[in-house]
């Protein structure tokens, strides 16, 4: 059964534009290779963080809306955790 999810992740500000694009493509690939379908990718760009994380106070924000099986978010979470440059991430199930 496919469910709708939304993920927001923040990449380290020291990454250049190419590295950010590569990371976004990597995460999109994880979703698509896991049988999910991407509905929307919204790159918010560099923004100030609400609070300092690891001595960093800004980062590159990206939002991805996708539809996937319930097992896929666990794999996506694992990939976020092992990827250098990801400061924070969250994956939530959309009920709407």
Q: PLM features: residue spans?
A:
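Structured, basic alpha/beta domains of bacterial-type, RNA-associated proteins
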Residues: 2-96
């Amino acid at each position: 059964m496919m469910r709708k999810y939304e993920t927001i992740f923040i990449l380290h500000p020291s990454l250049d534009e190419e590295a950010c694009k590569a990371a976004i493509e990597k995460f999109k690939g994880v979703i698509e290779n896991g049988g999910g379908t991407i509905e929307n990718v919204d790159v918010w760009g560099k923004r100030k963080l609400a609070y300092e994380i690891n001595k960093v106070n800004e980062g590159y924000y990206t939002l991805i809306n996708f539809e996937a099986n319930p097992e896929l978010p666990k794999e996506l979470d694992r990939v976020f955790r092992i990827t250098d440059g990801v400061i924070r991430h969250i994956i939530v199930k959309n009920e709407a």
